[in-house]
Amino acid sequence: IAAPSILARYFLPKLLGRFQDMYPKTKFDVQIAQSSDVISLASSLGIHFGFVRNDFDWREDERVLLTTNHVCAVAAQPFKLEDLPHMVRVDYDTDQYYQNLLDGWWHETFEDSPIIGTRVSNLDLCKEMVFNGLGYGILPSILIEEYPQLYSIPLVHKNGSKLERKTWLIYKKELLDLRLPKVFLEFVIDSDFDSFQRNH
């Protein structure tokens, strides 16, 4: 199994734990990778299953939509969306697909470039910096649910649609000839993926 760190941290422990309760002899090999790298691993059959956070080009009959999360502007103090170009942002490294999504939203919404005050290596560190008042962040809603004291505003495109990130399970059909991968896929499909979130 391969997954981005946010999914590995917030969803996989409970998901894999429940599956192992049903099939105690199951062993897992879990790799942390950005969604684009998960796609490469799944394409080369380097993994049985991949969890990805983007709408990559993958066969419809070899993927399952698990959940959809909104992307929000988040800060430790109250703010309005129109304040963002004048506020300091905590930015983070992410895969190119998501970066393009965020940049596209920003440029359709504001004329000025964002003021980057701090750059960190990942989403979790960005969240902690925001929590401690170092600036605002643009974060997926699943990261901020455990911090109700933070102020958040969902990002919306000019056409009124919310900025979202979908979570997919991807696989290759030929691996379903093996019993355990087939059972695991059925388990994930039959489950409420959001129930595996860490703070639920």
Regions found by a protein language model. Name each.
Residues 33-87, 143:
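Acidic, Gly/Pro-rich loop/turn segments at junctions of secondary structure
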